[in-house]
Regions:
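Compositionally biased, intrinsically disordered low-complexity regions
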Residues: 5, 58-61, 129
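Edge beta-strands of extracellular beta-sandwich domains
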Residues: 154-162
Length: 162
């Protein structure tokens, strides 16, 4: 499905000018929602959020901001930068990773200012959640770093520098 995403323009077009967003909105939106599900780290909590959102906003006219705030509250994570990145820009963030013998440094690039979003990494075949920002952070390992990749369920790109 990601191969069909052109990232030609933001999902949310400009308001008040009768101009729609990207034709990618369904495929890209699907990937964004799936990534959000991963961020919840618990399928039951994610589905409970969707049910609560349906109940809360039943038969109302709402805005994207209403949904974004609701999901942030239910997840316990400030996702404002996440939504700004994925809904209001066409770009997919890139996790820049610099490997060392016993760990790695990482930060988000090709993203909005002060972007932050958790991401699940596979480090020596073990799942590890990290919370990158646009500033460098580090993760040290006790054993030698043999294998490193991003979980494919996270909708982002990764660039590893040896």
């Amino acid at each position: 499905m990601r191969k069909r995403i052109g990232n030609d323009k933001p999902i949310i077009g400009p308001y008040g000018v009768n101009k729609g967003g990207s034709g990618d909105m369904y495929n890209k939106g699907n990937n964004i929602i799936h990534y959000l599900k991963q961020i919840f780290k618990n399928d039951d909590a994610f589905y409970a959020c969707l049910r609560a959102m349906n109940k809360e906003f039943y038969h109302q006219t709402i805005t994207s901001a209403d949904i974004e705030q609701f999901i942030s509250e239910k997840s316990g994570i400030n996702l404002s930068k996440f939504f700004d990145q994925y809904l209001r820009t066409k770009d997919i963030p890139v996790l820049l990773v610099k490997k060392s013998k016993k760990g790695f440094r990482y930060k988000w690039t090709e993203c909005i200012e002060n972007y932050e979003a958790p991401v699940k990494m596979l480090v020596n075949n073990h799942a590890v959640w990290i919370s990158p920002t646009t500033s460098w952070k580090s993760l040290r390992q006790k054993e030698k770093l043999a294998d490193l990749s991003m979980d494919q369920n996270c909708y982002a790109e990764i660039k590893i520098i040896e």
